[in-house]
């Protein structure tokens, strides 16, 4: 049935659906997991890295996380070549604003500007939508730390914690369960990110080379964006495994005590 209505982006089906936009969303569902968590003292992005090759140079290579300006970074899920075009556009928009107004662009304004472009590509004839969802983290003087998500159709929203990519529904339900509003520090957010990735990634054992993590904090009145080194990620994974083992032991001991009763 859909074949008659999905050859062009601009044709509505009788149910009022745009199939090409839905297919773009489908591409994101097969991409590596990306999640963002907002804490009181910062905000983080954690992403699954699929393209791991021992000959890749880490200094120049970041598969999932991009710095946009001094106050913002983003993570992508979907077609990487589309993501490169959009991140370049984001950087241009941010620099134009800085040149024009002599102050950094507010986070939401940058997200809105890109979403206008994404939405236009769902209307133009002969063009396809961008097959990319983005998570944005940032800080501005108006609203402090912020986390946004945008989709191929041009929709966006502000979040406290969210996930895009493969197994995102399972990840979001875990975040909903474990996110403690008003109590989240960056340290506890990092632990939660590792816990969620460990449960949702399609690997038997989580390893540091398959995970990319970036944090955004404020120090001495300046925004600091850091991509964690592999050793730091290894330590986080090790700590998580120790806590899991401890919880498992306590559970077994509790069960044993109940049996003995």
UniProtKB/Swiss-Prot annotation:
A Pfam family assignment: Proteasome
Q: Which residues carry this modification: N6-acetyllysine?
A: 127, 176
Q: Which GO terms describe its cellular component?
A: nucleus; P-body; proteasome core complex; proteasome core complex, alpha-subunit complex
Where are the stretches annotated Disordered? 240-261
Source domain of life: Eukaryota
Annotated membrane-spanning segments are none
Q: Where is the protein localized? A: Cytoplasm; Nucleus
Give UniProt keywords alphabetically.
Answer: Acetylation, Cytoplasm, Nucleus, Phosphoprotein, Proteasome
Enumerate the Gene Ontology biological process terms: ubiquitin-dependent protein catabolic process
SMART domains under this entry?
Proteasome_A_N
Which positions does the record annotate as the modified residue Phosphoserine? 13, 75, 173
Q: Does the keyword Transferase apply?
A: no
Its subunit composition reads:
The 26S proteasome consists of a 20S proteasome core and two 19S regulatory subunits. The 20S proteasome core is a barrel-shaped complex made of 28 subunits that are arranged in four stacked rings. The two outer rings are each formed by seven alpha subunits, and the two inner rings are formed by seven beta subunits. The proteolytic activity is exerted by three beta-subunits PSMB5, PSMB6 and PSMB7.
Family of this protein: Belongs to the peptidase T1A family.
Protein purpose: Component of the 20S core proteasome complex involved in the proteolytic degradation of most intracellular proteins. This complex plays numerous essential roles within the cell by associating with different regulatory particles. Associated with two 19S regulatory particles, forms the 26S proteasome and thus participates in the ATP-dependent degradation of ubiquitinated proteins.
Q: What is this protein called?
A: Proteasome subunit alpha type-4
Q: Which gene encodes it?
A: PSMA4
């Amino acid at each position: 049935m859909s074949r008659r209505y999905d050859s062009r982006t601009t044709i509505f089906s009788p149910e009022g659906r745009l199939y090409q936009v839905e297919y773009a969303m489908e591409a994101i569902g097969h991409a590596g997991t990306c999640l963002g968590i907002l804490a009181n003292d910062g905000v983080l992005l954690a992403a699954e890295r699929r393209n791991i090759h021992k000959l890749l140079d880490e200094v120049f290579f970041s598969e999932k996380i991009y710095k946009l300006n001094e106050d913002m970074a983003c993570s992508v899920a979907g077609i990487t070549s589309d993501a490169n075009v959009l991140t370049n556009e984001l950087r241009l928009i941010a620099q134009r604003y800085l040149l024009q107004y002599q102050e950094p662009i507010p986070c939401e304004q940058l997200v809105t500007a890109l979403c206008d472009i994404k939405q236009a590509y769902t209307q133009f004839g002969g063009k396809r939508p961008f097959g990319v969802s983005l998570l944005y983290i940032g800080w501005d003087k108006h609203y402090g730390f912020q986390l946004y998500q945008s989709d191929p159709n041009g929709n966006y929203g502000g979040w406290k914690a969210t996930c895009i990519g493969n197994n995102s529904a399972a990840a979001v339900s875990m975040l909903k369960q474990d996110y403690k509003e008003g109590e989240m520090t960056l340290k506890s957010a990092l632990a939660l990110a590792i816990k969620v990735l460990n449960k949702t990634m399609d690997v038997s054992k989580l390893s540091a080379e398959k995970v990319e993590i970036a944090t955004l904090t404020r120090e001495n009145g300046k925004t600091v964006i850091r991509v964690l080194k592999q050793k730091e990620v290894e330590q986080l994974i090790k700590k998580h495994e120790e806590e899991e083992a401890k919880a498992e032991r306590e559970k077994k001991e509790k069960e044993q005590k109940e049996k003995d009763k």
